[in-house]
Amino acid sequence: MLKDLYKTQIVPSLQNKLGYSNVMQVPKIVKVCLNMGLGIRGSDSKVMNSCVRDLALIAGQKPVATSVKKSIAGFKIRKGFPIGCKVTLRNNKMYEFLERLIYVVLPREQDFKGLSINQFDGCGNISIGIKEHISFLEVDYDKIDKILGLDINIVTNAVNNKDAKLLLMEFGLPFIN
């Protein structure tokens, strides 16, 4: 499991590579946030229910429905309009999800060559977009109404992008350069 790998191999390795004197200075993954945005399709309760069901299967816990905070006439949306769903994973469920992401989902993703350094936000967090949520084995292809995208945000406590990239490379995430 990735949690055991982190404690036994990744922490000592990163401590040597980054030159930290204390184990607590080594960066770690704090949480993983999953988000499915539906846009205007969120008004259809059938699509919204399937989105919540699929994200619950993928994450292993119940997602929260997100709604519009401010009305925008140009986008034809009103305040309180359902627009997607999200879930935050921590601790054991986070490591289980990362293991499935690294070893199952990313290899199944079409045209995936690796992650780019441009996907980092400057503070050590990375955002990954999955074009088709059917890449996850938990989602039954026969029961889905529509193929949706999925946003994955991996939040670390790393000081900069370089440290976060080293951490994620130790976990096995593939990078282009």
From Swiss-Prot:
GO terms for biological process: translation. InterPro entries: Ribosomal_uL5 (IPR002132), Ribosomal_uL5_bac-type (IPR020930), Ribosomal_uL5_C (IPR031309), Ribosomal_uL5_dom_sf (IPR022803), Ribosomal_uL5_N (IPR031310). Keywords: Ribonucleoprotein, Ribosomal protein, RNA-binding, rRNA-binding, tRNA-binding. It comes from the Bacteria. The keyword Nucleotidyltransferase does not apply. GO terms for molecular function: rRNA binding; structural constituent of ribosome; tRNA binding. GO terms for cellular component: ribonucleoprotein complex; ribosome. This is one of the proteins that bind and probably mediate the attachment of the 5S RNA into the large ribosomal subunit, where it forms part of the central protuberance. In the 70S ribosome it contacts protein S13 of the 30S subunit (bridge B1b), connecting the 2 subunits; this bridge is implicated in subunit movement. Contacts the P site tRNA; the 5S rRNA and some of its associated proteins might help stabilize positioning of ribosome-bound tRNAs. Part of the 50S ribosomal subunit; part of the 5S rRNA/L5/L18/L25 subcomplex. Contacts the 5S rRNA and the P site tRNA. Forms a bridge to the 30S subunit in the 70S ribosome. PANTHER family: 60S RIBOSOMAL PROTEIN L11-RELATED. NCBIfam families: PRK00010.1. Belongs to the universal ribosomal protein uL5 family. This is Large ribosomal subunit protein uL5.
